[in-house]
C-alpha cells in the first residue's frame, strides 16, 4: 500500500523541518546568525492513466489523466541572509555591517572564511581577531600605546596614540559580497565558506555602492523571529501528526483486507 510509504516521507520531511526550526530557536541570541528554512519538493509520480491519449474506444482524447504522487523530499535548507537588528554594546571593537557584505576571516590553516558577526578583539600582539582568535582580513594591528580606536563607516581604522590631538590611520577594512549568498556553506562558529554555488567573493570597501557600511559599538543580532518560529513549529507538528494518522489508517485498512481474506 503506497499510502504507507508516502506518509513516511511526509513524517521524515517534517522531522527535518522540526530540526531546522529547533536550531533557529537555539540560535535566537547568536550574533549574526541567519535563520534557516527547509525547502521541500514532491517526489516522482506514478501514472495510472495518461492524459492526451485516445480513450478505450479510440474515439476521443482523454482530457485529464490520473497521476499519483509518491511523497515529498527535502530539496534544500536555505539560510535567509536578511539584515538582523542592531544592538548597541558600547564596545569599541564590536562592529556591525549595515547592508550587504561579509567580514573576511583567516582560519589557522590559512583558509579565508566569512562572517556577519563583528564581535572582535585584539590578541597578545595587537592583531584584530574574532572571539575565537581568528585573524580579521586584511590584517590590522593596534599599537600597544593606543588610547582610542575608531572604525569609520567606510572601514578606515584610526587610533589615538597617547595624548595626540589627531587620529592616525592604521588600516582599512574590506568586506566581501557574493552573487548567491544562499550558496555559502555554514561551518559553525558564525562562519561561512564559499562554494561553487556561491561564486567567488567580490571584495570592496565598506560604504561603496553595493557594499555595507560599518557601524562601530554595535552588533548585528540574529534575524530569527520567535513568533514565526513558534508558528512554524506548530504547523510542522500538525503535519507530522496528520502523516502519522495516514499511516495508522492505511495499517487499519490493510488489517481489514487481511482479516476478510481469512
UniProtKB/Swiss-Prot annotation:
Main location: other
Record has Glycoprotein as a keyword: no
SUPFAM superfamilies attached to this UniProt entry: Flagellar hook protein flgE
InterPro entries reported for this sequence: Flag_bb_rod_N, Flagellar_basal_body_rod_CS, Flagellar_FlgE/F/G, Flg_bb/hook_C_dom, FlgE/F/G-like, FlgG_G_neg, LlgE_F_G-like_D1
Gene Ontology biological-process entries: bacterial-type flagellum-dependent swarming motility
Known partners and oligomeric status: The basal body constitutes a major portion of the flagellar organelle and consists of four rings (L,P,S, and M) mounted on a central rod. The rod consists of about 26 subunits of FlgG in the distal portion, and FlgB, FlgC and FlgF are thought to build up the proximal portion of the rod with about 6 subunits each.
Protein's name according to its UniProt entry: Flagellar basal-body rod protein FlgG
UniProt lineage: Bacteria, Pseudomonadati, Pseudomonadota, Alphaproteobacteria, Hyphomicrobiales
Amino acid at each position: 500500500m503506497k499510502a504507507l510509504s508516502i506518509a513516511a516521507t511526509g513524517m521524515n520531511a517534517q522531522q527535518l523541518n522540526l530540526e531546522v526550526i529547533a536550531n533557529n530557536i537555539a540560535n535566537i541570541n547568536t550574533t549574526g546568525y541567519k535563520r534557516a528554512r527547509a525547502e521541500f519538493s514532491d517526489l516522482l509520480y506514478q501514472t495510472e492513466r495518461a492524459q492526451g491519449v485516445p480513450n478505450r474506444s479510440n474515439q476521443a482524447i482523454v482530457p485529464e489523466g490520473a497521476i499519483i504522487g509518491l511523497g515529498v523530499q527535502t530539496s534544500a535548507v536555505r539560510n535567509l541572509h536578511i539584515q538582523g537588528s542592531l544592538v548597541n554594546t558600547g564596545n569599541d571593537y564590536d562592529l556591525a555591517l549595515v547592508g550587504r557584505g561579509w567580514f573576511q576571516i583567516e582560519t589557522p590553516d590559512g583558509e579565508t572564511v566569512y562572517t556577519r558577526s563583528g564581535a572582535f578583539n585584539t590578541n597578545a600582539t595587537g592583531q584584530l581577531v574574532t572571539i575565537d582568535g581568528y585573524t580579521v582580513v586584511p590584517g590590522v594591528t593596534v599599537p600597544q600605546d593606543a588610547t582610542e580606536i575608531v572604525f569609520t563607516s567606510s572601514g578606515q581604522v584610526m587610533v589615538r596614540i597617547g595624548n595626540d590631538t589627531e587620529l592616525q590611520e592604521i588600516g582599512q577594512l574590506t568586506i566581501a559580497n557574493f552573487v548567491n549568498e544562499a550558496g555559502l556553506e555554514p561551518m559553525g562558529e558564525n562562519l561561512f565558506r564559499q562554494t561553487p554555488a556561491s561564486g567567488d567573493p567580490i571584495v570592496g570597501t565598506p560604504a561603496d555602492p553595493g557594499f555595507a557600511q560599518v557601524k562601530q559599538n554595535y552588533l548585528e543580532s540574529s534575524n530569527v523571529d520567535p513568533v514565526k518560529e513558534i508558528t512554524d513549529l506548530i504547523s510542522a507538528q500538525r503535519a507530522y501528526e496528520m502523516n502519522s494518522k495516514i499511516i495508522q489508517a492505511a495499517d487499519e485498512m490493510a488489517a481489514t483486507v487481511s482479516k476478510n481474506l481469512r
